């Protein structure tokens, strides 16, 4: 069997796509948090988001990662709804 040309740490296509989904979710959460009017609330939410992503950084199980992305999207939508209500 021929040796692979790819380095051992190369992501599969599925892993690459999941990583992009996670990074997009992270960016969207931070962008939404920037809209929070109160400085202390904004800092708390930013620290919370960073800690959650940092804590789950080592997850490798496909189903677990998919579930966390779904939960993150639901929390993002909840934050967006809360901000919309606060502005109205």
Curated annotation (Swiss-Prot):
InterPro entries, A to Z: Complex1_LYR_dom (IPR008011), Complex1_LYR_LYRM2 (IPR045293)
Any one Gene Ontology cellular component term annotated for this protein: mitochondrion
CDD domains: Complex1_LYR_LYRM2 (cd20262)
Cysteines paired by S-S bonds: none
Biological processes annotated in GO: mitochondrial respiratory chain complex I assembly
Cell location: Mitochondrion
Keywords: Mitochondrion, Transit peptide
Transit peptide, start-end: 1-19
PANTHER family tied to this protein: LYR MOTIF-CONTAINING PROTEIN 2
Family: Belongs to the complex I LYR family.
Role according to the record: Involved in efficient integration of the N-module into mitochondrial respiratory chain complex I.
Protein name in UniProt: LYR motif-containing protein 2
């Amino acid at each position: 069997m021929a040796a692979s040309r790819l380095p051992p740490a190369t992501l599969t296509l599925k892993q690459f796509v999941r990583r992009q989904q996670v990074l997009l979710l992270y960016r969207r959460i931070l962008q939404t948090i920037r809209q929070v009017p109160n400085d202390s609330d904004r800092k708390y939410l930013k620290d919370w988001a960073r800690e959650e992503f940092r804590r789950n950084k080592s997850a490798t199980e496909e189903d677990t990662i998919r579930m966390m992305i779904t939960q993150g999207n639901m929390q993002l939508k909840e934050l967006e709804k809360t901000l919309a209500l606060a502005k109205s």
